[in-house]
């Protein structure tokens, strides 16, 4: 029986991994579709599309799937699939933690209902557009990996008009920040300077963090974020939650 239980657990764990991988593929494919629709279907002339394709390849999405997603965005591939739109949702979690969600959906009513349920079941409230976004800033982020000469990085960052950079704890990576509209320029400048770019993306950052010390509230927030992230329509979830070191293992 012990062997059977272990096998059952392995199967459950594999199912979770497969489900997460499937959601990642869905997210990245939708991002390619939207990027191709908003600009040229050629990655050479569309930075948003180029970065979406790079993420997809890094995640192991087959080239034929990527090409199909580009064609869908360009309108040259019709399989009856609905159009996706980008929507931002905002709300509050337990303890007043601000939550910012970016989604790509073909049915905004379904997505809103799913999110409203996730919030209400975990002590939160889905709010109106703008209720928490003022607490966050939108930035371009270029992640560098490998051996990095800080003097060379400083010089390239100045040329690329970066706003700053910081090392990621317990890794060999550095994140370089810029204004949203400057991301493509910064990314190209860093590559031209010989740095290895792992990723270039837009990201939300909280202006101030909400420090919670109540273990139940922290667990509730983390559960809600996990529930929201599991929704197919959700692309990103950002909060202003700050977890004290004593609760870091929750």
UniProtKB/Swiss-Prot annotation:
Give the UniProt subcellular location, in the record's own words.
Answer: Cytoplasm
Q: A GO molecular-function term, please?
A: DNA binding
Q: Name one Pfam family in it.
A: Transcrip_reg
| Presence of the UniProt keyword Zinc-finger in the record | no
Gene Ontology cellular-component terms listed: cytosol
What biological process terms from GO does the record include?
A: regulation of DNA-templated transcription
The primary site where this protein sits is: cytoplasm
Keyword field: Cytoplasm, DNA-binding, Transcription, Transcription regulation
**Gene3D superfamilies, alphabetized:** 1.10.10.200, 3.30.70.980
Q: Which InterPro entries match?
A: Integrase-like_N, TACO1_YebC-like_2nd/3rd_dom, TACO1_YebC_N, Transcrip_reg_TACO1-like, Transcrip_reg_TACO1-like_dom3, YebC-like
Similarity comment: family membership: Belongs to the TACO1 family.
What is the name attached to this protein's record? Probable transcriptional regulatory protein SYNPCC7002_A1640
Q: Which organism is it from?
A: Picosynechococcus sp. (strain ATCC 27264 / PCC 7002 / PR-6) (Agmenellum quadruplicatum)
* Phylogenetic lineage: Bacteria, Bacillati, Cyanobacteriota, Cyanophyceae, Oscillatoriophycideae
């Amino acid at each position: 029986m012990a062997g059977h239980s272990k096998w059952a657990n392995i199967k459950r764990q594999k199912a979770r991994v497969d489900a997460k991988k499937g959601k990642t593929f869905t997210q990245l494919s939708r991002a390619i579709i939207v990027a191709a629709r908003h600009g040229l279907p050629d990655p050479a002339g569309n930075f948003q599309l180029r970065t979406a394709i790079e993420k997809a390849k890094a995640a192991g999405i087959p080239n034929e799937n990527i090409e199909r997603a580009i064609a869908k965005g360009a309108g040259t591939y019709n399989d009856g699939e609905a159009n996706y739109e980008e929507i931002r949702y905002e709300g509050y979690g337990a303890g007043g933690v601000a939550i910012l969600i970016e989604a790509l959906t073909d049915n905004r009513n379904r997505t809103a209902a799913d999110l409203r349920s996730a919030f209400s079941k975990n002590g939160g409230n889905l709010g109106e557009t703008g209720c928490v976004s003022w607490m966050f800033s939108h930035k371009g982020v270029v992640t560098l990996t490998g051996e990095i000469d800080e003097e060379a990085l400083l010089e390239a960052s100045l040329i690329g008009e970066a706003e700053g950079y910081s090392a990621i704890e317990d890794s060999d990576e550095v994140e370089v920040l810029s204004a949203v509209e400057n991301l493509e320029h910064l990314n190209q400048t860093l590559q031209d300077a010989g740095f290895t770019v792992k990723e270039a993306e837009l990201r939300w950052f909280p202006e101030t963090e909400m420090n919670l010390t109540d273990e139940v509230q922290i667990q509730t927030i983390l559960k809600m974020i996990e529930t929201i992230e599991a929704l197919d329509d959700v692309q990103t979830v950002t909060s202003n939650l700050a977890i004290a070191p004593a609760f870091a293992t929750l």
